């Protein structure tokens, strides 16, 4: 282990010299002094991510090289544990970036993700297709060394990650697998960008109060704020869940509900943001990757390490669900349609953009309760208190607010 430490120290010095230590001020590349090592969200800026990924990947590769170049015979500690601990800074940077990308994405973050994706894929291939590294893992795996249960689990997962990542492939298949994986990562990112762009492109802007019939006051107030944020007059409804869901549930304007439903359910199906061809390409790439790795379908590959294990198990489970649930669903649709017909609905069949509206009406008629009445009981603060209180009662966990950690 001393030889690894020396090599890492030397490599770290070289990396610092090469970068002139410009990243010393990057909060993603400096150890947090906050409690529990919490990220410095108050200091992290969008421009910090790309250089952080570049340096973190370089450091992670150096850590991998140190394992490979260790002159000592492969052991669980100097190979499997060392590999598990390698790339910890990269894990931190990626964890922060990708969580924010999912929770609060924008075009700048999407552009960074597009640049980072091939970098991360290349690093993944650097590890999974690294023959000397795999040889060390294989030696430990085949050594029959006695391990504790958690150690044995780590070894098994490490071994499988290499095998499922193409380590046993020949040189030509490795090159094919690497190329396909990079293509897939870029197409998957583009798919997400198209969905985001298509979602942001649609807004239903209403300027006549008559068009708001049926909408509760809290929905109207939110629509005013949405309009202001988009520099529009009147009331604006977009395809975000709170705005879309409320409109579909309360609006009496069936034509506008249909417009909203069509916009939501046909996102990214036409124009520059169309995902139709991307879906075909992604499905084809997944199949080719699975075939290269020796699986009949991508489902066989994806399910192997999951609870279901096989596509057959999934299909059987779905069939078991269908048998009791399909008749019940049809009965509920029939009941909803009959209620709607009795209350002024004139169409011969109920449409997807009618379900939310008439379900809310039926619930109100049957139970004399609406979401608006329940709203005061489900304020965010109340829900947080309830969740923490339940954790305390069930598991004895106590949560205390920290004001010294930026969010």
Describe the predicted segments one by one.
Residues 1-9:
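Bacterial N-terminal signal peptides that target proteins for export
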Residues 154-155, 193, 198-238, 285, ...:
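Active-site-proximal, well-structured secondary-structure segments within enzyme catalytic domains
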Residues 24-215:
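N-terminal helix-rich structural modules
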Residues 17-20:
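C-terminal motif of bacterial Sec signal peptides marking the signal peptidase cleavage site
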Residues 4, 23-24:
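Intrinsically disordered, proline/serine/threonine- and acidic-rich regulatory linkers
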Residues 33-48, 97-116, 137-179, 238-277, ...:
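Short His/Asp/Glu-rich catalytic/ion-coordination signatures at enzyme active sites or charged loops
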């Amino acid at each position: 282990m001393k030889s690894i430490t020396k090599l890492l120290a030397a490599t770290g010095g070289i990396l610092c010299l090469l970068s002139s230590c410009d990243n010393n001020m990057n909060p993603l590349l400096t150890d947090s002094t906050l409690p529990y090592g919490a990220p410095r969200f108050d200091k992290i800026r969008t421009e910090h991510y790309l250089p952080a990924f570049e340096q973190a990947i370089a450091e992670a590769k150096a850590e991998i090289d140190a394992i490979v170049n260790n002159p000592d015979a492969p052991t669980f500690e100097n190979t499997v544990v060392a590999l598990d601990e390698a790339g910890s800074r990269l894990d931190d940077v990626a964890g922060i970036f990708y969580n924010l990308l999912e929770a609060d994405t924008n075009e700048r973050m999407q552009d960074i993700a597009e640049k980072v994706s091939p970098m991360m894929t290349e690093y993944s291939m650097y590890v999974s297709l690294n023959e000397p590294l795999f040889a060390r893992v294989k030696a430990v795996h085949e050594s029959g060394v006695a391990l504790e249960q958690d150690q044995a689990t780590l070894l098994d997962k490490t071994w499988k990650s290499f095998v499922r990542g193409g380590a046993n492939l020949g040189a030509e298949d490795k090159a094919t697998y690497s190329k396909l994986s990079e293509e897939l990562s870029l197409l998957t990112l583009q798919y997400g960008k198209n969905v985001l762009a298509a979602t942001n492109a649609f807004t239903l802007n209403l300027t006549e109060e008559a068009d708001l019939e049926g909408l509760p006051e809290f929905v109207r107030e939110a629509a005013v704020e949405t309009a202001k944020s988009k520099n529009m007059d009147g009331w604006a409804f977009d395809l975000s869940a709170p705005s879309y869901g409320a409109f579909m549930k309360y609006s009496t304007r069936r034509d506008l509900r249909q417009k909203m439903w069509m916009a939501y359910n046909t996102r990214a199906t036409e124009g520059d943001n169309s995902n139709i061809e991307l879906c075909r390409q992604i499905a084809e790439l997944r199949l080719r990757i699975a075939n290269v790795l020796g699986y009949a379908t991508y489902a066989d590959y994806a399910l192997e390490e999951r609870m279901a294990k096989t596509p057959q198990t999934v299909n059987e489970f779905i069939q078991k669900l269908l048998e009791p649930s399909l008749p019940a669903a049809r009965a509920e649709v029939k009941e909803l349609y009959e209620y709607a017909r009795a209350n002024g609905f004139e169409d011969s069949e109920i449409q997807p953009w009618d379900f939310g509206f008439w379900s809310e009406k039926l619930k109100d008629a049957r139970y004399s309760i609406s979401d608006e009445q329940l709203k005061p009981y489900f304020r965010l603060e109340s829900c947080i208190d309830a969740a923490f209180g339940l954790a305390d009662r069930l598991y004895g966990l106590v949560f205390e607010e920290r004001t010294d950690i930026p969010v």
